[in-house]
Amino acid sequence: MERYQQLFKQLAAKNEGAFVPFVQLGDPTPALSLEIIDTLIAAGADALELGIPFSDPLADGPTIQNAALRAFAAGVTPGICFEMLAEIRKKHPTIPIGLLMYANLVFHNGIDTFYQRCADVGVDSVLIADVPFEESLPFRTAALRHGIAPIFICPPNADDDLLREIASHGRGYTYLLSRAGVTGAENHGQLPLNHLIDKLCEYNAAPALQGFGISEPEQVKISLAAGAAGAISGSAIVKIIENNVSQPAEMLAQLANFVTNMKAATRS
């Protein structure tokens, strides 16, 4: 959890926002996935948001669903994902690592065991996409017991009560949705979220990172101008992987270029 606090403190001192890429662990293969993650970090990623492939990802559009299918085809399991996480943490000791996943994977070996495993490999936060705040108590309790930040999604239509609850119980960062629906770079709609960010700040919530449909530097600038601490981009990155599966060198070059440009937008 402290890695997020350190990150936001360092970025504030430099007057920068955070750029956080999302990828599925093991896509398209475990070995190339580790190279991809090294490339994202070298190109300027401030933190990582990583998915554990799941067979029924309700919040994800086709791009990220296909990433999970590629990982499954490469034989990726939750066990392999945790081995990869341990390797990433060993190589990159300071970068915040967040998991974005689904409840079935948490339930599989028991909630407490799952968070213990996360702590053992150096994961900083967990966001469970299909658990609404109202049902989050057993998850957030176990998370805090093991020093893991529970991350909550703040939807664009959140009422005051929900904003207070998210501010009170969230740690690390707050995942601010650009819009309702599923993930996807092709779904551009960005709502004016200034009022939500103002309220979250008023209630002392963890810093807001805006996600869903973030695929261009200009959108990063808009998020920061609205008061967000940074932006998360997933589908646009995963699409680069999908389009270059057979040419890894080109894939890594395009990923580096994309992240460099998105990170540059956090500095203006």
UniProtKB/Swiss-Prot annotation:
Q: Which reaction does it catalyse?
A: (1S,2R)-1-C-(indol-3-yl)glycerol 3-phosphate + L-serine = D-glyceraldehyde 3-phosphate + L-tryptophan + H2O
Stored Pfam families:
Trp_syntA
What's the top EC group for this one? Answer: lyase
Any one GO cellular component localisation term in the record:
cytosol
Q: Which UniProt keywords apply?
A: Amino-acid biosynthesis, Aromatic amino acid biosynthesis, Lyase, Tryptophan biosynthesis
Query: Metal-binding as a keyword?
Result: no
Gene Ontology terms, MF aspect:
tryptophan synthase activity
Asked if Hydrolase is a keyword of the record, the answer is: no
Give the EC number(s) listed in the UniProt record: 4.2.1.20
Q: Where is the active site?
A: E49, D60
Pathway(s) annotated for this protein in UniProt: Amino-acid biosynthesis; L-tryptophan biosynthesis; L-tryptophan from chorismate: step 5/5
Bilayer-crossing regions: none
Organism domain of life:
Bacteria
Please describe the quaternary structure of this protein: Tetramer of two alpha and two beta chains.
Q: Which PANTHER family match?
A: TRYPTOPHAN SYNTHASE ALPHA CHAIN, CHLOROPLASTIC, TRYPTOPHAN SYNTHASE, ALPHA CHAIN
> What role does this protein play?
The alpha subunit is responsible for the aldol cleavage of indoleglycerol phosphate to indole and glyceraldehyde 3-phosphate.
Q: Which family would the database say this protein is a member of?
A: Belongs to the TrpA family.
Q: What is this protein called?
A: Tryptophan synthase alpha chain
UniProt source species: Yersinia enterocolitica serotype O:8 / biotype 1B (strain NCTC 13174 / 8081)
**What lineage, starting at the top, does this entry show?**
Bacteria, Pseudomonadati, Pseudomonadota, Gammaproteobacteria, Enterobacterales
Q: Which gene encodes it?
A: trpA
